[in-house]
Amino acid sequence: MSWQNNLRSVSPYIAGEQPELTDIIKLNTNENPYPPTSVAQLFNERYKTKNLRLYPSTDAKSLRKKLADYHHLEVEQVIIGNGSDEVLSLSFLTFFNSQSPLLMPDITYSFYPIYCELYRIPFQKVPVDDDFKVLIKDYCIENGGIVIANPDAPTALALNLKDIEEILKKNQNSIVLINEAYIDFGGETCLPLLKKYDNLVVVQTFSKSRSLAGIRLGVAYGSAEAISHLYDVKNSFNSYPIDSLAQIIGEASLMDEHYFQKNIQKIIKTREVFKDNLVNLGFEVTDSKANFVFVHHPKVKAEELFKALYEAKIIVRHWNQPRIDDWLRITIGTNKEMNKVIEFLKGYLKKNEEIDEWKK
Amino acid sequence: MSWQNNLRSVSPYIAGEQPELTDIIKLNTNENPYPPTSVAQLFNERYKTKNLRLYPSTDAKSLRKKLADYHHLEVEQVIIGNGSDEVLSLSFLTFFNSQSPLLMPDITYSFYPIYCELYRIPFQKVPVDDDFKVLIKDYCIENGGIVIANPDAPTALALNLKDIEEILKKNQNSIVLINEAYIDFGGETCLPLLKKYDNLVVVQTFSKSRSLAGIRLGVAYGSAEAISHLYDVKNSFNSYPIDSLAQIIGEASLMDEHYFQKNIQKIIKTREVFKDNLVNLGFEVTDSKANFVFVHHPKVKAEELFKALYEAKIIVRHWNQPRIDDWLRITIGTNKEMNKVIEFLKGYLKKNEEIDEWKK
């Protein structure tokens, strides 16, 4: 016997690298290339840090109300957490307390199985089809809950509302958790379905479309009943998860709708041009509705390309995982950054072709 | 069957009220009456919020290093969390994964049993003696871990290092978690015992002595091995728990040792004067080593006094709980605030005495 016998054994999630080099093109963690609204700067500068001696609002009351108004929901339908990872984690702990398996696509956010291991939640991976599409009919089996990212990471593919409604309808005895971290980049939010389904919980984040990954704000929306249970678990975990500065910066973000929309449109435009350029270079690219693309080249091993990009100080994401080990996920940066990526790829593919020719 | 069947049932912690009134004397959540160092204001004003588009360091690297240096520890012996409540919560999840009960005093921080319920950890409350003292010999029974607050809340009593070492020695097969949230107000930290015991984990916070409850920074110190396990669980829960602003404000706090020490001494001085005044009014007061006092008056029901104080806009803390339902916990505020409390109590006790006289 030793204290080591009482440890919870887990295999933790490994987040995308945050390299300390400064002259890199960082396209590996789906951060927004543009800053948050300047209102955030203003609010932060004006904040009197003497107020930090006091605890923050336990439910980020004012921000919570503003989010409810923004989405035409009741305040009781909203809960804010310390980034969407915390919201997801506490949702798993709250809602998936079943002997039946939680269902999730086999290709999706790799944190889900880690939450399951942490909380001892049985789960079952449901294979997507050869085009990485989620097949609705596969989610009509016995389960203790369902989690789907829409759009998905890393595939970047989105589901339509009709498909999500079908899943909700067929699973009224399970919570269906839809992770909409990337929804603002072209997907269709399922928040309107909250009017009809009390088993729907939708998670969103300030990290991507609102350029606030550094301040850690995630949100879940659901029926007032579902959210009240999530609050009970949150209040059994941490009374004050959102610090006072994060609360005011979140509010600042909501005040500048014009900048928010402009920022998103810029990224979508860059994505579409980047996709066209990739296709012209012979890449296969999924129909991205996110701020990243998922790509594959028939003539180049993804792992080799990943390393070549890394050496050129362009950091993207690659997983050594069945079905996607020949694919790369590339975040959409600025136009200038994406042009540099295309230039690099052109040179790389040309050199590769020459070597192939020479081998013949 | 319904989705409600799969819910985790919990009875959440209820934090001390954060009233929205402005002209109150707020002595109910052990906040510091003085602001944090002015370096925090400076750092915050200068921060460029454009950097918030990027994720923060997953382990608050720079702050972690500074804390290690401050306490003459290795960086691997330090983990930072989103307030000490998160650090405690993740410590329970990591270390107390046993069939044997976790031991804790019966009178202590009331969040501990709530973590146990959340994570299904068996626990056993060990009665303190009639003077609220923790009896070391009672912790030499079979257990899956031990958690003790030093100084304790709400009793305000501290243990000495010899007693803590005795517990560590007798329980080398269990993690002994010492919650030092209030240690800077007169207790003796057990951090030096980390040199000898790899089963010791010490939790501290920026919320009390550093006047930073609003920014949510808690810390655990332990052996490099214990902390690495805590990191594995943290990284299975949330990759980025500390936002970028909290990290720089924590660093600002560590840069102003002079202000920090002065602030603590002021509070201790106010506490000692307040205690003397209370004793002169006939109160029983425990030997506080914290930024609050735990008090009882032989002639007045605590609950009635709590209500009378509340009506006078002086908010303190009372628990309807066996053994302490006739006690109040009062945070140490400014001299001016504590003088007002004494003035109120004088008037209240005098009126009470007159009523008693009249009844005869």
Swiss-Prot record, chains A, B:
Gene3D superfamilies named among the record's database cross-references: Aspartate Aminotransferase, domain 1, Type I PLP-dependent aspartate aminotransferase-like (Major domain)
Pathway as given in its UniProt record: Amino-acid biosynthesis; L-histidine biosynthesis; L-histidine from 5-phospho-alpha-D-ribose 1-diphosphate: step 7/9
Signal sequence interval, chain numbering: none
Keywords tagged on the record: Amino-acid biosynthesis, Aminotransferase, Histidine biosynthesis, Pyridoxal phosphate, Transferase
GO biological process, one term: L-histidine biosynthetic process
Enzyme Commission code: 2.6.1.9
InterPro entries recorded: Aminotrans_II_pyridoxalP_BS, Aminotransferase_I/II_large, HisP_aminotrans, HistidinolP_aminotransfase, PyrdxlP-dep_Trfase, PyrdxlP-dep_Trfase_major, PyrdxlP-dep_Trfase_small
Cofactor: pyridoxal 5'-phosphate
N6-(pyridoxal phosphate)lysine PTM positions: K208
Family statement: Belongs to the class-II pyridoxal-phosphate-dependent aminotransferase family. Histidinol-phosphate aminotransferase subfamily.
Subunit structure and binding partners: Homodimer.
HAMAP family to which the protein is assigned, alphabetical: HisC_aminotrans_2
Protein name: Histidinol-phosphate aminotransferase
Gene name per UniProt: hisC
